[in-house]
Regions:
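A conserved hydrophobic secondary-structure block that centers on an alpha-helix together
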Residues: 162-165
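Conserved catalytic cores of very large enzyme subunits
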Residues: 1-141, 169-177, 181-668
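Extended amphipathic alpha-helical scaffold segments
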Residues: 152-159, 210-214
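Low-complexity, highly charged intrinsically disordered N-terminal segments
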Residues: 141-144, 148, 152
Length: 668
């Protein structure tokens, strides 16, 4: 669908930051007010939501149909540094930063409306009147609900003053009550999600948008209140609106603010759930061509070819999405880990790729990363120096290193205390019924660990296996000296390690065996940790986040080990592959071989997520036949049994020009 003239102008205005003149640095002094009133931690969190909502004036620009423009640049702290230090000393544990990277039950909140959830909170308060903690939480939750309702009411009043009765009607209706139109549902979702950011949280995803919004759109279409062009116009404006404030959201510097959407898949009963809004969301995301929302698509080997073609059109734009998740691997894997079937079928992703359950998970999916290259390197250096007689001894050392890394990352997290989140709790399943803030836990409370640098770690092990122990053509002392020298003076050895040893990514069973072994040992190490201190377990995954850089070059405060030169021929400081990808610079036969390699990972044990990452030149996408080929590649991804995949479109000239003229490439 082409964007209308109205929306094209709106998009360009957002890209240019035309609305930034509304912004200011005057934020409420929550710490001072809370101290003067003697408020608790939970009460302070509620006060922040209340004051931040009150500090947002209604801004309605001409022709806007989806409104909310954030004016306050900063979210204020709840304590002064001195007061926080004193309060922290009273806690029996280690407090974390604000809760983030989870997904609200947006469908339930829209379906019920905030007034119904407010009534539930008050009923629970009456039932638990003798429980001071429950009373405090529920009163805090009600205060946040009231602040959102007031914000919506002020926007409605301004819309009415401007003669925008259509917009006023939508705001009068929702989020207070269940929307009766697609427009009202989108507007309510915009406000509800924006206030999560205002409350100090980040990486606020939108979950299975095509599932929970479809009933509203279907009703409008059936009643003749809306046609498809009008529906796509509204959805496009909603997508554009998500980019108005995204530069204020933490994480945008590395291209990730967590506004992810999951499309397609099955419903909680296992029935096919692709609907007309699934298709429309793909079309609209392509027309809008902005970084938010980040589109994910659930697929199987049987997904409709035309749907995959539509997704491939979106990939062609070079935005890095859609990201694909294979239901045939993800759902059974989650069930094997302990999730109920109904919840597993309802999965979405957190900010990046970690699989979570909307409304039911208080999972911390990114507590750190195991460095496979560091584990392999430590084992190789120690084993060769000690004169280990066989390769199995190297593997035994590597397994011990992996276990040590996992334990070192998880043990401190057992004392973790999550800060109260009264408004976010309103949007989840359970807190208003139990009288307990979501920080106390929900149905699922697992931790997630990334398994980073898997190809480099496996390639290093394979080099030792082939050259030192199998062929016996490389003296251990020579390799150790070369590693210590970062291969300076050992260039021929480095070339041999890089070019003659079999590598991960070519569907070579010998090299891939090291990859599978690493993930099996990683899963075993996570399982051995048992309970995480919050009633959950440790989920191993295949993602890297930014660890593909940090584990190679370090960063301030990094807990994970940084490794130097490695036995796969990698120089000190060279980056690792991102997520599941061959080591940079390795020659691979093609994308299918890469998919076949990573399909060997035991995804029934590795459930935290992390995509196979493929980089395709943009000329691959020229012509409609090319879209068919990319669609077939996505189908092959599902057929061979991979779990998750991201395809990036690369044009070197465009990227170089974007470095020189970023203002001309704001869509990247």
């Amino acid at each position: 669908m082409p964007l209308s003239e109205r929306l094209s102008a709106m998009r360009e205005a957002v890209r240019a930051g035309a609305h930034h003149h509304y912004r200011h640095d005057d934020t409420p002094d929550i710490a001072a007010e809370a101290a003067a009133r003697g408020l608790t931690w939970a009460q302070r969190a509620a006060l922040r939501t209340v004051r931040m909502c009150a500090g947002e004036p209604p801004i309605i620009e001409p022709d806007q149909r989806i409104v909310f423009t954030r004016t306050q640049r900063r979210v204020p702290p709840l304590y002064t540094p001195d007061d926080w230090a004193a309060f922290r000393a009273t806690l029996d544990g280690d407090p974390s930063g604000e809760i983030n990277n989870i997904c609200a039950d947006w469908g339930a909140v829209l379906d019920q409306g905030l007034l119904a959830r407010r009534a539930q909170a008050l009923a629970t308060r009456a039932r638990l009147a003798a429980d001071p903690a429950a009373v405090e939480f529920l009163e805090a939750a009600v205060a946040t609900i009231d602040s959102v309702l007031d914000l919506a009411a002020r926007y409605a009043a301004e819309a009415r003053r401007l003669g925008r009765n259509d917009l006023a009607a939508a705001l009068d209706e929702a989020p207070a009550n269940r929307p009766t139109s697609f427009h009202a549902a989108l507007q309510a979702l915009r406000l509800l999600q924006a206030v999560v950011w205002l409350s100090g949280h980040m990486h606020v995803g939108l979950g299975r948008l095509d599932q929970y919004l479809w009933p509203y759109l279907a009703a409008d279409l059936a009643a003749g209140r809306l046609d498809w062009p009008g529906a796509e116009e509204l959805l496009a404006e909603f997508f554009i609106s998500l980019n108005r404030d995204s530069d204020l959201y933490p994480g945008v510097q590395v291209g990730d603010n967590g506004q992810s959407v999951m499309l397609g898949g099955v419903d909680r009963a296992g029935r096919e759930a692709v609907n007309p809004l699934t298709w429309a969301a793909l079309r609209v995301a392509g027309a809008v061509a902005m970084i938010d929302p980040k589109i994910n698509l659930r697929v199987t080997p049987d997904t409709d070819h035309e749907l995959l073609r539509e997704a491939s059109r979106l990939t062609r734009l070079g935005l890095g999405f859609p990201q694909y998740a294979n239901d045939d691997q993800v759902i059974p894997g989650l069930v094997a880990f302990g999730y109920d079937w109904e919840d597993a079928r309802d999965y979405t992703v957190a900010a990046c790729w970690e699989f979570i359950i909307p409304g039911r998970g208080m999972e911390i999916v990114n507590v750190g990363a195991v460095s496979f290259p560091a584990a392999a390197d430590a084992a190789i250096r120690a084993g060769l120096a000690a004169g280990d007689a066989g390769f199995q001894s190297i593997l035994d050392r590597c397994e011990a290193e992996i276990r040590a890394q996992v334990h070192a990352l998880i043990e401190p997290e057992r004392r973790l205390i999550l800060p109260p989140a009264p408004y976010f709790s309103v949007l989840m399943d359970g807190p208003l019924a139990t009288g307990r803030d979501l920080s106390a836990g929900l149905k699922y409370n697992n931790f997630g660990l990334h398994g980073a640098g898997c190809a480099a770690g496996a390639d290093a092990l394979q080099a030792i296996h082939e050259l030192v122990y199998d062929q016996r053509t490389l003296a251990p002392g020579d390799l150790l000296a070369a590693l210590d020298a970062d291969f300076e003076g050992y260039e021929s050895l480095r070339t041999r390690l890089r070019e003659t040893v079999t590598k991960v990514g070519n569907n070579d069973d010998d090299a891939d065996a090291q990859l599978v072994w690493l993930f099996e040992r990683f899963a075993a190490a996570c399982a051995a940790e048992g309970d995480n201190g919050r009633g959950g377990r440790i989920r191993p995954g295949t993602g890297t986040a930014m660890f593909y850089v940090w584990l190679a070059r370090g960063r301030a405060g990094l807990r994970e080990p940084v490794v130097g030169a490695t036995a796969d021929g990698r120089h000190v400081g060279d980056l690792f592959g991102a997520n599941l990808a061959p080591t940079p610079g390795v020659t691979v036969r093609g994308p299918l071989s890469t998919l076949q390699t990573f399909a060997k990972i035991p995804y029934d044990q590795i459930v935290n997520g992390g995509p196979v990452t493929l980089e395709l030149a943009d000329n691959v996408f020229r012509g409609d036949e090319a879209l068919d080929k990319v669609a077939l590649l996505v189908r092959a991804f599902a057929q061979v049994g991979c779990q998750q995949m991201q395809i990036n479109t690369v044009n070197l000239a465009t990227l170089e020009d974007a470095q020189r003229h970023p203002e001309q490439h704001r869509h990247l």
